[in-house]
Amino acid sequence: MKKILMWLTVLTLMLTGAAFADQENAPVMLVKLPEDAQMVENVAFDDGDFIQTYQLSGGAYVQLLRYAQGDVTLDGIVAGDWPGATDIQSMALETVGGYAAKGLMLSVEPEDEEAVRVALVLVSADRCALVYQAVYPQRLGDDQIDDAVQRMVDSMDVLGGSAAKDVG
C-alpha cells in the first residue's frame, strides 16, 4: 500500500511539474506601450491565465491577458465585458506573430460613467487565447485614440509557442 501511495505521489508531482513547464513555454503577447505606461496590475493564476494592466495618460489603460483555454471569442468578451457596445468595427488584422488574430473597435457609454472607445485584439496561439484590450476615454477624440491603438497593434508580436519556433 505504501508503494502505491508513493507512486501516486510521484505521478502527481510529475504531472504538476509538466503542467508548470507547459505554462512557462506558453505564448505571451508583446506590445510596445506608450512611454508613460505604468504597470498597475500583474496577476498570474495557477491554470496559466494572467492579467497585466497598464495605466496610460489621459485616463486610458491597456490590459494584456492570457487565457489557458483557447475557447475565448471577441463576441464573448464584448458580451461579457462591454454590454451595450455600439459602433462595433472590425480591424484589418489577420495575424500577429504568425498566429491567427482578429480585432474590433467599439464604443461604450456606461451608465453614470464616461463614454469610452475600446480596442480588442484576440490572438489564437497554440492552446491559448491572448487578448489585448485598450480602453480610452472618448473625450480624447477618435483620431488620437485610433493613432495610439494603431501604433500598438503594429508593434504586436507573440513570444513563445509553436509558431515562433517554426519561424526560426
Q: Language-model segments: which ranges?
A:
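Secretory pathway targeting signatures of secreted, lumenal, and periplasmic proteins
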Residues: 27-76, 109-114
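Positively charged n-region of N-terminal signal peptides that target proteins for export
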Residues: 1-4
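Short, solvent-exposed coil/turn segments at beta-strand boundaries
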Residues: 33-36, 56-59, 97-99, 122-129
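Surface-exposed amphipathic alpha-helical segments
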Residues: 29, 34-38, 131-168
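Short glycine-aromatic motifs
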Residues: 36-40, 85-88, 101, 156
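Bacterial N-terminal signal peptides
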Residues: 8-16
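Sec-dependent signal peptide cleavage junction
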Residues: 15-27
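Signature of long, low-cysteine stretches enriched in small and polar/charged residues
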Residues: 79-126
